[in-house]
């Protein structure tokens, strides 16, 4: 499971011209699901994101987590994160989960975040989405669990 996490002052996702998910201050999570991902990866990444200190304290140091700043999370599926880009001029997706498995893991991941008390908005799995964001910093982290 791969998560590309961006600290944002706002973010939204649009499908067919309609905003279907939006947040204020918080994190945008672009989530790529691999074939072998399951409950262990879901819990590991969800726990990491809830505890990760990527928000600035009063001294400007990254010492606060999402809960401490009252932030929100926008989760958007992005299968291209699992692409193999090592060979040739075209990405390979053999590591990626099937659409059925990917959607199930995506939904379980969102549920895991909500079960931890996080305010979560989402995109639409498998849809052609337009993602808008204001990256705060910019601050971006790559997690591979």
Curated annotation (Swiss-Prot):
<dbReference type="GO" id="GO:0005737">
    <property type="term" value="C:cytoplasm"/>
</dbReference>
<dbReference type="GO" id="GO:0051500">
    <property type="term" value="F:D-tyrosyl-tRNA(Tyr) deacylase activity"/>
</dbReference>
<dbReference type="GO" id="GO:0000049">
    <property type="term" value="F:tRNA binding"/>
</dbReference>
<dbReference type="Pfam" id="PF02580">
    <property type="entry name" value="Tyr_Deacylase"/>
</dbReference>
<keyword id="KW-0820">tRNA-binding</keyword>
<keyword id="KW-0378">Hydrolase</keyword>
<dbReference type="GO" id="GO:0019478">
    <property type="term" value="P:D-amino acid catabolic process"/>
</dbReference>
<protein>
    <recommendedName>
        <fullName>D-aminoacyl-tRNA deacylase</fullName>
        <ecNumber>3.1.1.96</ecNumber>
    </recommendedName>
</protein>
<comment type="function">
    <text>An aminoacyl-tRNA editing enzyme that deacylates mischarged D-aminoacyl-tRNAs. Also deacylates mischarged glycyl-tRNA(Ala), protecting cells against glycine mischarging by AlaRS. Acts via tRNA-based rather than protein-based catalysis; rejects L-amino acids rather than detecting D-amino acids in the active site. By recycling D-aminoacyl-tRNA to D-amino acids and free tRNA molecules, this enzyme counteracts the toxicity associated with the formation of D-aminoacyl-tRNA entities in vivo and helps enforce protein L-homochirality.</text>
</comment>
<dbReference type="InterPro" id="IPR023509">
    <property type="entry name" value="DTD-like_sf"/>
</dbReference>
<keyword id="KW-0694">RNA-binding</keyword>
<comment type="similarity">
    <text>Belongs to the DTD family.</text>
</comment>
<keyword id="KW-0963">Cytoplasm</keyword>
<dbReference type="GO" id="GO:0043908">
    <property type="term" value="F:Ser(Gly)-tRNA(Ala) hydrolase activity"/>
</dbReference>
<dbReference type="GO" id="GO:0106026">
    <property type="term" value="F:Gly-tRNA(Ala) deacylase activity"/>
</dbReference>
<comment type="subunit">
    <text>Homodimer.</text>
</comment>
<dbReference type="InterPro" id="IPR003732">
    <property type="entry name" value="Daa-tRNA_deacyls_DTD"/>
</dbReference>
<feature type="short sequence motif" description="Gly-cisPro motif, important for rejection of L-amino acids">
    <location>
        <begin position="137"/>
        <end position="138"/>
    </location>
</feature>
């Amino acid at each position: 499971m791969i998560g590309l996490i961006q600290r944002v002052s706002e973010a939204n996702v649009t499908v067919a011209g309609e905003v279907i998910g939006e947040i204020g201050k918080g994190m945008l999570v672009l989530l790529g699901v691999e074939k072998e991902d399951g409950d262990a990866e879901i819990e590991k990444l969800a726990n990491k994101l809830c505890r990760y200190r990527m928000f600035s304290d009063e001294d400007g140091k990254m010492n606060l987590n999402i809960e401490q700043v009252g932030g929100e999370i926008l989760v958007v599926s992005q299968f291209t994160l699992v692409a193999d880009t090592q060979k040739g001029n075209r990405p390979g997706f053999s590591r990626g989960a099937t659409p059925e498995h990917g959607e199930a893991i995506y939904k379980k991941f969102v549920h895991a975040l909500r079960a931890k008390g996080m305010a979560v908005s989402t995109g639409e799995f498998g849809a052609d989405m337009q993602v808008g964001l204001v990256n705060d910093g910019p601050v971006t982290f790559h997690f591979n669990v």
